[in-house]
Structures are given as C-alpha cells and as structure tokens.
C-alpha cells in the first residue's frame, strides 16, 4: 500500500501520530516502539541500522 502520505509525522512501526518521535536511519519511531524494539535487539528491524 502507498504510505507516502503518512510522512515523517508518524511512527513507522505503529503508524500512529505522536509528538515525541525519534529519528531512526531513514524513518521515525515513537518512544514506545523504540523502547519495545530495544528490549529485543540493538538494531532496528525495519532498516537494520543500530538504534
């Protein structure tokens, strides 16, 4: 599906709009998803770069 309209104002993991987005390599994550992802690995499962 075309998700280009979501832009950088959405978390790429849960796609919700949040005020506290953290930039990952080429996308953004909300703090909630970032904390969940950090519990399983130090690399982002979406872009494979270090969190």
UniProtKB/Swiss-Prot annotation:
Q: Which Pfam families match?
A: zf-P11
Instruction: Mark the RING-type zinc finger spans by residue number.
Output: 11-47
Q: What is its main location?
A: virion
- Please tell me one Gene Ontology term that the record gives under cellular component: host cell plasma membrane
Q: Does the keyword Mitochondrion apply?
A: no
A GO molecular function held by the record: RNA binding
Keywords, comma-separated and alphabetical = Host cell membrane, Host cytoplasm, Host membrane, Host-virus interaction, Lipoprotein, Membrane, Metal-binding, Virion, Zinc, Zinc-finger
Give membrane topology per the record: Lipid-anchor
Listed transmembrane segments = none
Give its localization.
Virion; Host cytoplasm, Host perinuclear region; Host cell membrane
Subunit comment: Interacts with protein NP; this interaction probably directs the encapsidated genome to budding sites. Interacts (via RING-type zinc finger) with polymerase L; this interaction inhibits viral transcription and replication, Z partially blocks the product exit tunnel for the releasing nascent RNA product. Interacts with the glycoprotein complex; this interaction plays a role in virion budding.
Anything noted about its domains? The RING finger domain is essential for the inhibitory activity of protein Z in transcription and RNA replication.
Q: What does this protein do?
A: Plays a crucial role in virion assembly and budding. Expressed late in the virus life cycle, it acts as an inhibitor of viral transcription and RNA synthesis by interacting with the viral polymerase L. Presumably recruits the NP encapsidated genome to cellular membranes at budding sites via direct interaction with NP. Plays critical roles in the final steps of viral release by interacting with host TSG101, a member of the vacuolar protein-sorting pathway and using other cellular host proteins involved in vesicle formation pathway.
Protein family according to the UniProt entry: Belongs to the arenaviridae Z protein family.
Task: State the name under which the record lists this protein.
Answer: RING finger protein Z
């Amino acid at each position: 599906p075309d998700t280009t309209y979501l832009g950088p104002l959405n978390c790429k993991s849960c796609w919700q709009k949040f005020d506290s987005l953290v930039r990952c390599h080429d996308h953004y994550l909300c703090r909630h998803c970032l904390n969940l992802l950090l519990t399983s690995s130090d690399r982002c499962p979406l872009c494979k770069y270090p969190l």
